[in-house]
Amino acid sequence: FTMSITLNGQLLLCLLAEGLMHIEGLRLIQVNTDGLTVRVPRQNKWLVDLARAGWQSRTGLNLEEAIYKTMMIRDVNNYIAQYEDGNVKRKGAYEYDMDWHQNAGGLVIAKVAEKVLTEDAPIRETLHNWPDIMDFMLRTKVPRSSHLAIERDGVTSQLQNITRYYIAEGGGRLFKWMPPLAKNPGQWRKIGVESGWGVHPCNDIKDAGKLPVDFDYYIREVEKLCLGLA
């Protein structure tokens, strides 16, 4: 039953999208499982309303409407949109108001990306002046069968299985040590975390700032969310 309702709803959205594509100047931005987004000249907005009303009458379903001032989209599941009243909608990689069960690592990346996209803020300067070191924190974890270790200056130190860290200049290399696979029963697997970057463990917040933040990493991550968007 659930599958039939889901498929039927998606097919009906496709029907709506097909009808909207006949409107002059309209551009279909995205179609998701529960809605769609279009860009249309203001003078043709009434045609969208007409198509919407006809679709609702035909299907017996109701459509909610939201009008954006601007929308920056990486893909259908990752985008940021600003309403006409200034409020912001965030999805996927652009979210930073996390629930307790979600990974709240690297919040500075999404927060700075939003400022870049909605306020035209400079990436490097905004990151360098960011006031909260906690927003730079990342985290990784491994199951009990594995362990985390950091290598620095020829010394290897084991870390707790859930470890908080930030990308730091002069930091060590972080690795996951995973149990052997059946085809190589005697060989533990060494998997890099943030390969190519130094990290500084920070399970105790007093350790924050002992090594300088490597801003180049965070600049690169912000650029991934800001450059080349539709």
Question: Which residues does each PLM region occupy?
Answer:
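Acidic/histidine-rich catalytic cores and adjacent linkers
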Residues: 4, 21, 42
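Conserved pre-motif C helix in the palm subdomain of viral-like polymerases
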Residues: 1-17
